[in-house]
């Protein structure tokens, strides 16, 4: 017996009046006029059924925190990061969970069933990690939540970032994150990419780095990330997030960079 049978729906590929048979959480048949008993049956009334939305870059630990501890008067990224630093000492596992769960439920209601969320590990208590691991487990029946160990204050710049990141990965965080443009120098940014990619390669994990999140055309950490991806055989497992500086770069340089990114299978999240 099927668990669920959804009748008379339209699919994105143009098929109409299709039935969808579901058992043990998986679609087992797509066809018209499926003849099978089901625990539950829904009449789709000819509505469109599509794959769920995916939010590939989010920060659930800071979701719904507008005005805490105060408003961002300048509206800039740097003030936003500073405000998050002011809020961190006031955080509790429960407060993070409450906001994150509310955001997850809101996302589910809008058709988003997969979220990749960065979680700040530059808090020696790892409260956000603990909270979002609990959220991941609670939301598991409804939402695929992937967590990225994110050194918000800089992997080399923050003294215990390496230790905290490894602790977070040991607890079950899924992806290695980074923020090379927030290190003190370009060379330290490159060094952070190298070390973080080596950690990911050693553990068989994916990488998702905030990269070049500025208007500076000389911020070219995506090139280093692409190189390390190739060097360590991480092809297809690495994401560059933001990549804002690319719009300011010289066209000739970008014409060289883009093929290298494609060759390495770099995923880009321009958000």
Segments from the language model and where they lie:
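Histidine-rich, glycine-flanked metal-binding segment
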Residues: 1-50
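Metal-coordinating catalytic core of metallo-dependent amide/deamination hydrolases
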Residues: 90, 117-243, 247-248
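Active-site gating loops and adjacent loop-to-helix segments of metal-dependent hydrolytic enzymes
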Residues: 64-96, 172-175, 221-239, 262-267
């Amino acid at each position: 017996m099927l668990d669920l049978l959804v009748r008379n729906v339209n699919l994105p590929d143009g098929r109409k009046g299709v039935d969808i048979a579901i058992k043990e959480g998986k679609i087992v048949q797509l066809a018209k006029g499926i003849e099978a008993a089901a625990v539950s049956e829904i009449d789709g009334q000819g509505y469109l059924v599509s794959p769920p939305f995916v939010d590939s870059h989010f920060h659930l630990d800071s979701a719904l925190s507008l005005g805490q501890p105060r408003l961002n008067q300048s509206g800039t990224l740097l003030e936003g990061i500073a405000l998050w630093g002011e809020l961190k000492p006031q955080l509790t596992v429960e407060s993070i969970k409450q906001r994150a769960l509310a955001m997850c439920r809101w996302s589910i209601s809008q058709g988003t069933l997969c979220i990749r969320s960065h979680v700040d590990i530059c808090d020696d208590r790892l409260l956000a990690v603990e909270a979002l691991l609990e959220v991941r487990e609670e939301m598991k029946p409804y939402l695929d939540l992937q967590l990225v160990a994110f050194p918000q204050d800089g992997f080399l710049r923050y003294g215990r970032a390496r230790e905290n990141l490894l602790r977070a990965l040991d607890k079950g965080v899924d992806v290695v994150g980074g923020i090379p443009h927030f290190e003190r120098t370009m060379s330290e940014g490159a060094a952070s990419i190298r070390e973080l990619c080596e950690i990911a390669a050693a553990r068989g994990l994916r990488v998702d780095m905030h990269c070049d999140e500025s208007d500076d055309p000389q911020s070219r950490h995506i090139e280093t990330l692409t190189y390390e991806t190739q060097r360590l055989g991480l092809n297809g497992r690495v994401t560059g997030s933001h990549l804002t500086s690319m719009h300011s770069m010289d066209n000739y340089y970008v014409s060289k960079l883009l093929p290298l990114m494609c060759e390495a299978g770099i995923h880009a999240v321009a958000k």
